[in-house]
């Protein structure tokens, strides 16, 4: 009975903070907003340095960076109905991470989230650090890392891209659930119980969304290779070398 009551309480919170699972303005306590900004900013700075050093002087990479940003904006702006009147969305972060590495996407993802907060009331300024860390940092590194691991163990390119993109989506929601659990621990069970509740609720919609995003990313990457085959093929094969 206590578990049912706890889940019901979490469900009652969802419409208040979840706008496509970007944590909304004013929802996180101020100390947590500062913490997540302080964690995100070093990745933002590293991404800016990386872009200036490795991408800014290459027109083909700049075009792909712009495309990756548009892809993230389009997918993460979608708001699909979820449980208790809330909504969920794909992130789109995996495509850019696979093509260009995670550091550029730490910048692009943050810019996308800023525009969404200002133009779409989607997320917020005080919660931008938390949202950017979960999607643009954790999601990007998860997508890139699993893509590389899958390729090294012998999986096909399409399977590797699928796993990378899907994991980027799922990691975003795992970290968001952790952020909410840390800020709002359960009275019984603390952070662990709260995390289990939040992540369990959003798994209902995020698992199928992650699968769909993985499939879409494979399709988009294949189309990019057809129309920009030399550039995209080189990036897909050599992303890990670029990161070094």
Curated annotation (Swiss-Prot):
Q: How does it assemble?
A: Forms an energy-coupling factor (ECF) transporter complex composed of an ATP-binding protein (A component, CbiO), a transmembrane protein (T component, CbiQ) and 2 possible substrate-capture proteins (S components, CbiM and CbiN) of unknown stoichimetry.
User: Function, please?
Assistant: Part of the energy-coupling factor (ECF) transporter complex CbiMNOQ involved in cobalt import.
Pathway it belongs to?
Cofactor biosynthesis; adenosylcobalamin biosynthesis
What the entry lists under InterPro entries is as follows: CbiM, CbiM/NikMN
Compartments, as annotated in UniProt:
Cell membrane
Describe its membrane topology: Multi-pass membrane protein
Secretion signal, residue range per the UniProt entry = 1-20
The encoding gene: cbiM
Query: What are the TM regions of this chain, as residue ranges?
Result: 31-51, 63-83, 95-115, 117-137, 161-181, 201-221
Which cellular component terms (GO) are annotated to the entry? ATP-binding cassette (ABC) transporter complex
Query: Which keywords does this Swiss-Prot/TrEMBL entry list?
Result: Cell membrane, Cobalamin biosynthesis, Cobalt, Cobalt transport, Ion transport, Membrane, Signal, Transmembrane, Transmembrane helix, Transport
Quote the protein name from its UniProt record: Cobalt transport protein CbiM
Q: Which GO terms describe its biological process?
A: cobalamin biosynthetic process
């Amino acid at each position: 009975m206590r578990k049912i009551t706890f889940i019901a309480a979490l469900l009652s919170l969802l419409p208040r903070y979840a706008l496509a699972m970007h944590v909304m303005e004013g929802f996180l306590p101020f100390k947590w907003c500062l913490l997540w900004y302080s964690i995100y900013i070093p990745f933002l700075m590293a991404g800016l340095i990386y872009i200036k050093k490795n991408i800014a002087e290459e027109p083909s990479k700049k075009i792909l960076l712009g495309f990756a940003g548009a892809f993230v904006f389009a997918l993460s702006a979608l708001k699909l109905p979820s449980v208790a009147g809330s909504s969920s969305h794909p992130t789109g972060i995996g495509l850019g991470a696979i093509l260009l590495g995670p550091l550029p996407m730490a910048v692009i993802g943050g810019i996308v989230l800023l525009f969404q907060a200002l133009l779409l009331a989607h997320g917020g300024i005080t919660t931008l650090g938390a949202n950017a860390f979960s999607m643009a940092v954790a999601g990007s590194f998860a997508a890139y890392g699993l893509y590389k691991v899958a390729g090294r163990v012998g999986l096909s390119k399409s399977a590797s891209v699928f796993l990378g993109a899907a994991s980027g989506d799922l990691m975003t929601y795992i970290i968001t659930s952790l952020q909410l659990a840390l800020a709002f621990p359960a009275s019984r069970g603390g952070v662990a119980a709260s995390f289990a509740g939040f992540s369990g609720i959003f798994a209902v919609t995020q698992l199928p969304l992650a699968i769909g995003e993985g499939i879409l990313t494979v399709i988009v990457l294949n189309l990019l290779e057809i129309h920009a085959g030399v550039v995209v093929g080189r990036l897909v094969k050599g992303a890990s070398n670029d990161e070094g």
